[in-house]
């Protein structure tokens, strides 16, 4: 029996869903994504994060260290991904950590006073301009701490992980949106995610064992019928 005046305590939206919608706006602003598709991608990316972090913490244990570094996450990413995906994921992680270190070395300067006379340009180089991350490293750090590993976690390692997760999501979303556009739709459905993974060799090697609800089956064409 439902009581009047009481609101449901069930949460239908997760933080990952917000990040996924922000990514799809960057990739293809004309496309939207179904709620079920968001749930599928959230589950995929959580499993990937757990696999990467389990391998990274295992490397920390083997090296007798107490702090998880970006290098440990990088090695784990290379072990958990394949081919061009691995190469681009490592590249994105390195760029994110470089920007993070540059921001620490060159903090933003306060604006000059209006009464100050114009002076020559400063000799201090400006940090590289980069887009702000979609997935904040603080959110990932909170989730990784819930894995109950008794190790310290550096901020650079979470920046690296954030870049890798964003790259993997962007790859799947880009292929899924292309499939939806080819089918003359603007809504990304689970079928589009399934075909995006099934038709890509590297994504299929990583997620081919995953069952996607509502994804259907891969179409088979008999070459003798043509």
Curated annotation (Swiss-Prot):
<protein>
    <recommendedName>
        <fullName>Histone H2B.v1</fullName>
    </recommendedName>
</protein>
<dbReference type="GO" id="GO:0030527">
    <property type="term" value="F:structural constituent of chromatin"/>
</dbReference>
<feature type="region of interest" description="Disordered">
    <location>
        <begin position="100"/>
        <end position="130"/>
    </location>
</feature>
<dbReference type="GO" id="GO:0000786">
    <property type="term" value="C:nucleosome"/>
</dbReference>
<dbReference type="Pfam" id="PF00125">
    <property type="entry name" value="Histone"/>
</dbReference>
<dbReference type="InterPro" id="IPR009072">
    <property type="entry name" value="Histone-fold"/>
</dbReference>
<dbReference type="GO" id="GO:0003677">
    <property type="term" value="F:DNA binding"/>
</dbReference>
<dbReference type="GO" id="GO:0046982">
    <property type="term" value="F:protein heterodimerization activity"/>
</dbReference>
<feature type="compositionally biased region" description="Low complexity">
    <location>
        <begin position="114"/>
        <end position="123"/>
    </location>
</feature>
<dbReference type="InterPro" id="IPR002119">
    <property type="entry name" value="Histone_H2A"/>
</dbReference>
<dbReference type="InterPro" id="IPR007125">
    <property type="entry name" value="Histone_H2A/H2B/H3"/>
</dbReference>
<dbReference type="InterPro" id="IPR000558">
    <property type="entry name" value="Histone_H2B"/>
</dbReference>
<comment type="similarity">
    <text>Belongs to the histone H2B family.</text>
</comment>
């Amino acid at each position: 029996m439902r009581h009047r005046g009481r609101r449901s305590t069930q949460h239908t939206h997760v933080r990952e869903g917000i990040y996924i919608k922000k990514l799809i706006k960057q990739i293809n602003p004309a496309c939207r994504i179904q709620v079920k598709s968001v749930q599928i991608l959230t589950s995929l990316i959580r499993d990937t994060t757990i696999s990467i972090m389990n391998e990274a913490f295992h490397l920390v244990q083997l090296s007798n260290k107490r702090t998880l570094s970006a290098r440990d996450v990088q090695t784990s990413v290379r072990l958990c991904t394949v081919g061009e995906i691995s190469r681009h994921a490592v590249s994105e992680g390195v760029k994110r950590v470089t920007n993070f270190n540059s921001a620490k070395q060159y903090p933003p300067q306060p604006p000059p006073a209006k009464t100050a006379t114009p002076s020559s340009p400063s000799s201090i180089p400006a940090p590289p301009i980069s887009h702000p991350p979609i997935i904040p490293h603080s959110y990932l750090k909170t989730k990784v701490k819930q894995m109950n590993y008794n190790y310290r976690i550096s901020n650079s390692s979470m920046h690296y992980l954030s870049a890798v997760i964003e790259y993997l999501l962007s790859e799947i979303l880009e292929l899924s949106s292309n499939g939806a556009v080819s089918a003359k739709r603007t809504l990304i459905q689970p079928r589009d995610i399934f075909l995006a993974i099934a038709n890509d060799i590297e994504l299929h090697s990583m997620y081919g064992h995953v069952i996607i609800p509502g994804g259907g089956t891969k179409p088979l064409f008999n070459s003798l019928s043509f």
